[in-house]
Design a protein with these regions (language model features):
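Terminal RNA-binding accessory module
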Residues: 1-68, 366-367, 374
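Short, acidic/hydrophobic/Gly-rich beta-strand patch recurrent on exposed beta strands
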Residues: 15-20, 152-155, 219-221, 353
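Rossmann-like S-adenosyl-L-methionine
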Residues: 3, 11-13, 227-462
Length: 462
């Protein structure tokens, strides 16, 4: 297809074109681009394509700042100026709430953009692999590398291939320096990188966590099958400790399984502490190697402030915090509430929530672990009291119908619904509409250069 004009943005960071009533989804283009398209997949009502030639570039186009753009699979909206990114995210929220929710809405507040659009993440995970991914350009030029080992990110659709990352713009540059130093040391001393198909090799993954307190955690994960490999591994860790004295938590994990999950594995301290801290309004949140914490610390604070403001707390309320995670929101609003009860599926997260309450001398929170639809029942409410306010922050799939039914039974005065998926949020708002009216909507951009958007909605009992 020749000289097709890109019309709009779509889900998953792609853009839309239309040819003879056929809707076409195209990645890495922006509205206003005029391109030739090559169809990759065709369905009855839509097709997926890629741009193979640009005839005109949109005036609303930015130059990508990352050398890995278009290959690593992340930051797909680098080609859009940030002002355009947040405009489309605002539109995404409005479209979802109106098209799917079909409910009466107030005026939607302007999106809260991120002050940082680069180096805004506090956590990144990198993968080692003995199969370096070669870009199309490298293949065309028949580039030969002395090293086919790589450390970086998985290529979308090719789990055993890893794109060698020289510089990632998502996390503080210390992350790049540590990763590249480990890579170079491993090259120089002939360490083996994992083969993701056969599971042979030593170095597997590394995780870097930074924090607003200036603390720095590095976790190196390896496979050890022979005794001498442990000695080699500790030599690598000593090199990291000597080279980067600013690391406050240098940890390691032995993973001899066939998958990369670490939740069921022991974490060992090589140097420093087994945790770092995040801070927010004088509260300290302990973050361990397996802990969940919002990956954009500064915007997380803004998000939580919106949730607290919408909750309208005076100090007398019983608050339920559903899908509480490690209890960050629950502990954050506890000073303005009579009591906060947090419920979360993951037992380890609930233990973190209790620890964080103890660290901050918070005595008016209770935390329970269990599946939400099994925990939040009429009996639970009869036992613990009817909530005045419910704050809910469910996963992308939204809330289970049973959970919504119990919320309707409980009839809190206000519901604050925090969502990372405005589409499922809109569906749930429609289900709550029989008793609740939407009073305020506040989108928040947590992830610049991606299509993801958070949205906070205040509902009040009719």
């Amino acid at each position: 297809m020749e000289k097709v004009t890109i019309m709009d943005v779509a889900a998953e960071g792609k853009a839309i074109a239309k040819v003879n009533d056929l809707v076409i989804f195209v990645p890495y283009v922006v509205p206003g681009d005029v391109v030739d398209l090559q169809i990759k997949r065709k369905k009855n009502k839509y097709a997926e394509a890629e741009a193979v030639k640009f005839h005109e570039l949109s005036p609303n186009r930015a130059v990508p700042f990352c050398q890995h753009y278009g290959v690593c699979g992340g930051c797909k909206w680098q080609v859009l100026p940030y002002s355009e990114q947040i405009r489309y995210k605002q539109k995404q929220v409005e479209d979802n709430l109106k098209r799917i929710g079909k409910i009466e809405l107030p005026e939607i507040s302007p999106i809260l953009g991120s002050a940082k659009t680069e180096f805004y993440r506090n956590k990144l995970e990198f993968t080692f692999s003995n199969k370096r991914w070669l870009t199309s350009e490298e293949v065309r030029q028949d580039v030969k590398y002395d090293q086919m080992n790589a450390v970086g990110f998985h290529i979308p659709g090719a789990f055993d291939k890893v794109l060698a990352i020289e510089k990632c713009w998502l996390q503080d540059d210390i992350s790049n320096r540590i990763r590249n130093a480990i890579r170079d040391y491993a090259y120089e001393h002939d360490y083996s990188f994992i083969n993701l198909r056969t599971q042979e090799g030593m170095l597997r993954n590394m995780i870097v966590r930074t924090s607003s307190t200036g603390e720095l955690m590095v976790i190196v994960i390896c496979k050890i099958t022979e005794e001498h490999e442990m000695e080699l591994f500790k030599q690598l860790l000593q090199f990291v400790a000597d080279s980067f004295p600013e690391i406050t938590s240098l940890l390691y994990i032995i993973n001899n399984k066939c998958n990369d999950t670490i939740n069921d594995l022991d974490v060992h301290v090589f140097k420093g502490k087994d945790h770092i801290f995040e801070e927010m309004e004088g509260l300290r949140f302990k973050v361990g190697p397996k802990s969940f914490y919002q990956t954009n610390s500064e915007q997380a604070y803004n998000l939580y402030k919106v949730a607290r403001e919408f909750a309208g707390l005076t100090g007398n309320e019983l608050v339920y915090d559903l899908y509480t995670g490690t209890g960050t929101i629950a502990n954050f609003v506890s000073r303005q509430a009579r009591q906060v009860i947090g419920i979360e599926y993951v037992p380890e997260a609930i233990e973190d929530a209790k620890v964080n309450a103890e660290i901050n001398d918070i005595k008016n929170t209770l935390f329970y672990a269990g599946d939400m639809k099994d925990m939040l029942t009429q009996d639970f409410i009869n036992q613990h009291g009817r909530p005045d306010v419910i704050i809910t922050d469910p996963p992308r799939a939204g809330m289970h119908q049973d959970v919504i039914d119990v919320i309707l039974f409980a009839e809190p005065k206000r519901i604050v619904y925090v969502s990372c998926n405005p589409a499922t949020q809109a569906r749930d708002l429609q289900l709550l509409d029989e008793k609740y009216k939407v009073k305020a909507v506040q989108p928040v951009d947590m992830f610049p250069h991606t299509h993801h958007v958070e949205n906070v909605v205040l509902l009040e009992l009719r």
